[in-house]
A protein has these predicted regions:
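Bilobed "Venus flytrap"/periplasmic-binding protein-like clamshell domains
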Residues: 76-85, 95-112, 146-147, 164-225, ...
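Bacterial lipoprotein signal-peptidase II cleavage site
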Residues: 22-30
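Periplasmic-binding protein-like
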Residues: 81, 162-174, 246, 253-293
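Extracytoplasmic small-molecule ligand-binding "clamshell" domains
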Residues: 59-64, 70-142
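Extended ligand-binding regions for polar small-molecule ligands
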Residues: 59-63, 109, 174-177, 181-187, ...
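A ligand-binding cleft/hinge motif common to bilobed small-molecule-binding domains
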Residues: 128-129, 143-155, 198-207, 231-269
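Acidic, polar ligand-binding/catalytic clefts
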Residues: 104, 115-182, 265-266
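C-terminal motif of bacterial Sec signal peptides marking the signal peptidase cleavage site
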Residues: 17-20
Length: 293
């Protein structure tokens, strides 16, 4: 049986998930008893019936987003070449990372579903352009770890979540800070137009009863990406903290950058989905196909 893409994604991001696993009791097997030999009935040959051929999905409306993608034989996917470990350029200047692998699998399965192989064209618009909608047909889909928020859902259509994201806070490696309260009024860097910027402003609208309260009166500095924040920190810019994806922060630590993850648990947990522009061609058939993958 083919595994759903969401199941694969969830397994691949196990470090991002909080799961409680209980051990089930092993059932006691009853002793085997030998059944009496069955009397074989005379064989009668049933007339052969041909199983109905399985049909693929109906051809989509040519004016829909899905119809246009299939007609072009190409899907244009927005990504960020500076968002390791989710999407980045490797040493050979090829795209790599969790979101890149996910996008490649989406294109493969979508093409197989309609028997039309799809080529990928990578697009690299800025994050604020992606999250603000009104893409003007410049790309077809965002597969770039976009968190689902009420504000974003007003301008983009979200498919079913493909994983769940934990927010975190990075502090300098030698910092003595142990709580968010100690960051009140401090300098905090954040990626522009991200859920972390919204969280610091007290404007993040997600369903998470355990979302932590942001530090009061923080002096927020938004840069184009949170990776630019940690690079600025490494070059001596001197932020007191960086609000970012917890998995990304752990990656910075592994790379030897001068930060550590503040040990306070997730600041919030949010679902992450593929996004389609609501102002573009109709997205209904594309959403249905994505949710079947």
């Amino acid at each position: 049986m083919r595994k759903s893409l969401r199941l694969i994604a969830l397994a691949s991001t196990a470090a991002l998930l909080v799961a409680a696993c209980g051990s089930a009791a092993t059932p006691t097997q009853a002793p085997a008893t030998e059944a009496p030999a069955a009397t074989e009935a005379p064989a009668t040959e049933a007339p052969a019936t041909e199983a109905p051929a399985s049909e693929g999905p109906a051809a989509p409306d040519p004016e829909s987003l899905l119809g246009k993608i299939l007609a072009a034989g190409k899907i244009r996917i927005s990504t960020d070449p500076n968002y390791k470990p989710f999407s980045f350029l490797d040493d050979n200047q090829k795209y790599d990372g969790f979101d890149i692998k996910t996008a490649e699998e989406v294109a493969k399965r979508l093409g197989e579903m309609y028997d039309k192989p799809l080529e990928i064209e990578w697009m690299t618009p800025s994050w604020d352009l992606i999250t603000s909608g009104k893409w003007g047909g410049r790309w077809d889909i965002s597969i770039g770890s976009m968190s689902v928020t009420k504000t974003r859902a007003e301008v983009v259509d979200f498919a079913d979540p493909y994983y769940y994201d934990f927010g975190g806070v990075a502090v300098p490696k030698d910092s003595t800070v142990t709580s968010l309260d100690e960051l009140a009024g401090k300098r905090i860097c954040v990626g522009s137009s991200t859920t972390y910027e919204q969280w610091l402003a007290g404007e993040l609208e997600i369903i998470d009863p355990n979302m932590l309260k942001p530090p009061a009166g923080a002096e927020v500095t938004p840069l184009e990406t949170d990776n630019l924040c940690v690079q600025a920190q490494a070059s001596g810019r001197g932020f007191d903290a960086i609000a970012a994806n917890a998995n990304g922060i752990n990656d910075w630590v592994k790379e030897g950058l001068p930060v550590k993850l503040l040990d306070i648990g997730p600041i919030f947990t949010v679902s992450v989905s593929f996004a389609l522009d609501r102002s573009g061609p109709p997205t209904g058939e594309m959403l249905t196909a994505l949710n079947k993958i």
